[in-house]
Amino acid sequence: MNSPWKAEASRIALVSLGCDKNRVDGEVMLGLLERAGYQITAELEADIILVNTCAFIQDAKQESIEAILETARYRGNGRCRVLLATGCLAQRYPDELLRDIPELDGVVGTGEVGRVVDIVRRAATGERVREVGPPGFLGREVLPRVPSGSPFTAYLKISEGCDNRCLYCVIPQLRGPYRSREASVLVREARALAARGAREIVLVAQDTTRYGSDLKERTSLTDLVSRLAALEGVAWIRLLYCYPSGITFELVELMAREPRLCRYLDIPLQHASDRVLRRMGRSTMSYDLRKLILFLRSAIPGLTIRSTFMVGFPGETEADFEELLGFLKAMKLDRAGFFAYSREEGTPAARMPDQVPPEVKRERLERAAAVQREVSRALNRARVGSEVTVLVEGRKGEQYYGRSEADAPDIDGRVFLSAASDLEPGTFVRARITGAGPYDLRARVLSTLP
């Protein structure tokens, strides 16, 4: 049994997996623990290790289990005295994790983020904790956060949960119903993030476009962005996870005229075959998706559109898949990611007939990615010679690197910069594009921006 020790003598490390929304949870947990007196470290030679897990699809679950098993080595042979699994995998399989991984000292569900200090203290006394209740956590106040990733970019989680009932998805089970955070709290949190050095605020949720629809004082994503754009120090505001049916004329008009709102929309479309979209439980069909993309491009000059697509959904035929490939070639999205359908227990799709064989899913995944790679390469090559504004993030060898308005952190490419003088990370420069691949650009710095 573990013996208790003083909080101020304890070092805590976090391994965070999955999406940026999960990353925010990890930053909040570390912030609460730091405020309580624990020392935060990036090294796994720590007294306490939290593994913040993902359980969206099978690959994510496997990665999370492997991460727990890897850190369990420190539980047996290193300094670690407490090992906890947090996040979506802990929410979904708490008893299985405790049964199958004896090195675990506890599991902490998605609804217990705000109680992490008490849970860690109990685990430090030797109690094997199982804290998994309804996924009801919501940041109703500005909570402390320990930043991860680039110091110049911060994620702002504007809501929790999801009310969309896509038939393949377990997120509503793991995160609960859709719950918007109060706009006043979000503005205060964004102000604090900017004061800490964030030049870019990235808004995330399971569905950002639904924001405010559940609040007593009805508000909207457009209203929230307008308030955030007035904050001092915020240069870019970026929107991810925009549900196609939730994109309003007001939001489009704001993006067209507000210079701080990146001309960038991440719109998960999932497929282009009406037959597959209906089977998925999606509400917007292919004709309307095409119409939306054409409208957005005409209304917002210079807009970058990113999307995500699933291949191998139950019943997807070769004709359905060819329709998706045709959509990619015709609509020429700037960015697109692809993943293979994962048969998740407890979802309606898992019980559907005509499950697509794994080898077919893999082959379709490769074909779709190859088509999009050539689309992206051609679009990037067409930008050679044009000018772009870049947020400088760091240096690699002789080159600096950063991102343009068209590049979201972690998921899109980079702009590699050649400069006649030293550049300061966290600043913006104007550059001319000199070369392009399917993902990254090369550019020559023309001037530094204020």
Curated annotation (Swiss-Prot):
Q: Where is the MTTase N-terminal domain?
A: 10-125
Q: What is its EC number?
A: 2.8.4.4
**Any one Gene Ontology biological process term?**
tRNA modification
Asked whether the keyword 4Fe-4S is assigned, the reply is yes
Q: Which residues form the TRAM domain?
A: 381-447
Residue ranges occupied by any Radical SAM core domain in the UniProt entry: 148-378
- Which Pfam families does this entry report, sorted A to Z? Radical_SAM, TRAM_2, UPF0004
Q: Which reaction does it catalyse?
A: L-aspartate(89)-[ribosomal protein uS12]-hydrogen + (sulfur carrier)-SH + AH2 + 2 S-adenosyl-L-methionine = 3-methylsulfanyl-L-aspartate(89)-[ribosomal protein uS12]-hydrogen + (sulfur carrier)-H + 5'-deoxyadenosine + L-methionine + A + S-adenosyl-L-homocysteine + 2 H(+)
Q: Which Gene3D superfamilies match?
A: Methylthiotransferase, N-terminal domain, Nucleic acid-binding proteins, tm_1862 like domain
InterPro entries documented for this protein: Elp3/MiaA/NifB-like_rSAM, Methylthiotransferase, Methylthiotransferase_N, Methylthiotransferase_N_sf, NA-bd_OB-fold, Ribosomal_uS12_MeSTrfase_RimO, rSAM, rSAM_horseshoe
UniProt signal peptide: none
Identify which cofactors the protein needs according to its UniProt entry: [4Fe-4S] cluster
Instruction: Provide the binding site for [4Fe-4S] cluster 2.
Output: 162, 166, 169
SMART domains from the UniProt entry: Elp3
UniProt subcellular location: Cytoplasm
Q: What are the record keywords, sorted? A: 4Fe-4S, Cytoplasm, Iron, Iron-sulfur, Metal-binding, S-adenosyl-L-methionine, Transferase
Name any GO cellular component annotation.
Answer: cytosol
Q: Name one GO molecular function term.
A: 4 iron, 4 sulfur cluster binding
Q: How is the cofactor bound?
A: Binds 2 [4Fe-4S] clusters. One cluster is coordinated with 3 cysteines and an exchangeable S-adenosyl-L-methionine.
SUPFAM superfamilies the record matches: Radical SAM enzymes (SSF102114)
Q: Which PANTHER family match?
A: RIBOSOMAL PROTEIN S12 METHYLTHIOTRANSFERASE RIMO, RIBOSOMAL PROTEIN US12 METHYLTHIOTRANSFERASE RIMO
Biological role stated in the UniProt entry: Catalyzes the methylthiolation of an aspartic acid residue of ribosomal protein uS12.
Family per similarity comment = Belongs to the methylthiotransferase family. RimO subfamily.
Q: What is this protein called?
A: Ribosomal protein uS12 methylthiotransferase RimO
Q: What is the lineage of its organism?
A: Bacteria, Bacillati, Bacillota, Clostridia, Thermoanaerobacterales
